[in-house]
Amino acid sequence: MTQFASPVLHSLLDTDAYKLHMQQAVFHHYHDVHVAAEFRCRGDDLLGIYADAIREQVHAMQHLRLQEEEFQWLTGLPFFKPDYLNWLRDFRYNPEQVSVTNDNGKLNIRLTGPWLEVIMWEVPLLAVISELVHHYRSPEASVQLAMNTLEQKLADFTTLTAGLDMSRFHLMDFGTRRRFSRDVQEAIVKRLQQESWFVGTSNYDLARRLSLTPMGTQAHEWFQAHQQISPDLATSQRAALAAWLEEYPDQLGIALTDCITMDAFLRDFGVEFASRYQGLRHDSGDPVEWGEKAIAHYLKLGIDPQSKVLVFSDNLDLTKAIELYRHFSSRIKLSFGIGTRLTCDIPQVKPLNIVIKLVECNGKPVAKLSDSPGKTICHDKAFVRALRKAFDLPQIKKAS
């Protein structure tokens, strides 16, 4: 390593839980599916100057492998089957699947290959980019600065929640992808462990080492890929929901609702799906409006909302989480996943708004429409129109 003294990543499990959960489902159902994914910076940061350092880290990732103690720990979890874990034991990152270029200051990254393998790149690669950029931009920032900020926020949170029944408040760390650094995330999570309302982390490495519950089900890419895997676009979301239940019939039952839009999702989320899935996750659009729609939908189907859970994970901080808790906690179970506002909250440090999203499946376009227009991702405007038509959504003049 030259530009960065050593590899940023030290464990194959330093990733979000839903990546392994989805990878196992792909392993069992979609071995032959090929995909392409692309990096996008939603802000105005020109990150192309870091391309060489990122490429260096990508090559270092080929040396990561599942360690024996990690393998043994995974075998003790209820989610995984032996055939998948034995395959994962032999998994290695293939840097040839990753193209990293500096396009006049803009960072371009494209991932291509079997979905089974490409699925693993997104979270650790984003974490690497975030840590590299912050290392160069904010060399004076430290774990202690992050902890000082957290302690102040926790003190404010204690004041804010004084007299409030917090017995139904559950917070998870969702901060791997855009963390300031691996060390900051670990310190934050260790501190949060002291709070009775902290229930787990999406990071499998931290969950193992700190004896926490790993949290996560599926991401947008699960639904996006089914847009081309399913023979009929109009039923692709239902196909994705059904395939997930086939892999996980009675666990990991939180469904992400905004790959198309919440309204389109609820039209597909009939009584069987709503009964079998444990709850729903919010990731775009107005959270109060979304939660009200979810509760109304359960009631319409004759399902007691108190038997279900809503997971909020869109750009949350502690204050927003408490506002939502006050609004909904008497009517439905709740969990809150906070990412960047925990693991990259340091004075004078600007978090990166970066994502890697699926753009093709088996050589054909896929799209994420979402409930926030700025989060729409698709290169093919004709496919966006076809998707909106298939799901009975109004056409819009401009799609990014």
From Swiss-Prot:
Catalyzes the synthesis of beta-nicotinate D-ribonucleotide from nicotinate and 5-phospho-D-ribose 1-phosphate at the expense of ATP. It holds the Pfam family NAPRTase. It catalyses: nicotinate + 5-phospho-alpha-D-ribose 1-diphosphate + ATP + H2O = nicotinate beta-D-ribonucleotide + ADP + phosphate + diphosphate. Belongs to the NAPRTase family. Transiently phosphorylated on a His residue during the reaction cycle. Phosphorylation strongly increases the affinity for substrates and increases the rate of nicotinate D-ribonucleotide production. Dephosphorylation regenerates the low-affinity form of the enzyme, leading to product release. One of its GO terms (cellular component) is cytosol. GO terms for biological process: NAD biosynthetic process via the salvage pathway. Pathway: Cofactor biosynthesis; NAD(+) biosynthesis; nicotinate D-ribonucleotide from nicotinate: step 1/1. The gene is pncB. It comes from the Bacteria. This is Nicotinate phosphoribosyltransferase. The modification Phosphohistidine is found at residue 220. Gene3D superfamilies: nicotinate phosphoribosyltransferase. It comes from Escherichia fergusonii (strain ATCC 35469 / DSM 13698 / CCUG 18766 / IAM 14443 / JCM 21226 / LMG 7866 / NBRC 102419 / NCTC 12128 / CDC 0568-73).
